[in-house]
A protein has these predicted regions:
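N-terminal leader/targeting and pre-domain segments
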Residues: 1-21, 108
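Structural micro-motif
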Residues: 75-81
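Non-catalytic, surface beta->alpha helical segment in thiol-disulfide oxidoreductase systems
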Residues: 83-108
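ABC ATPase NBD coupling module
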Residues: 69-73
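Thiol-based oxidoreductase modules, predominantly thioredoxin-like and allied folds used
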Residues: 54-68
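Local sequence-structure signature of Cys/Sec-based thiol-disulfide redox active-site neighborhoods
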Residues: 15-51
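N-terminal, polar/charged subdomain of small-to-medium soluble alpha/beta proteins
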Residues: 8-13, 63, 92-93
């Protein structure tokens, strides 16, 4: 699984902005309408939320096409999953990796 430290960032009003300090347990999924991989990842997170209510928060779903900067950076990689501003995965999501990032904090 490819992981990359993206720095502390969150999406507010469709823009990428730094966070001070990091928000613990924040999940952002960058998606695109009509993307079957996006639907699979959002569905997986919803299922994991039901199974692990105390661990998995409600994700923030962001449309990559709503902002030119997002589209140019992430348009070819959706879905893109961040936990606390750290890129966890794109295209697919491994449940164990996701739960570990929420439980232990995201890592490289």
């Amino acid at each position: 699984m490819w992981r990359h430290q993206h720095g502390m960032a969150a999406l507010r009003s469709g823009e990428l902005r730094p966070l001070d300090p990091p928000v613990e347990g924040r999940v952002i999924i960058v998606t695109r309408q009509g993307c079957h991989l996006c639907d699979e990842v959002v569905g997986l997170v919803a299922r994991l939320r039901q199974e692990h209510r105390d661990l998995v928060p409600e994700p923030m779903i962001v449309d990559v096409d709503a902002n030119e900067d997002l589209r140019s950076r992430w348009g070819d990689h959706v879905p893109v999953i961040f936990v606390d501003g750290t890129l966890i995965s794109y295209w697919t999501l491994d449940a164990d990796t996701f739960l570990s990032a929420l439980r232990d904090g995201p890592s490289l």
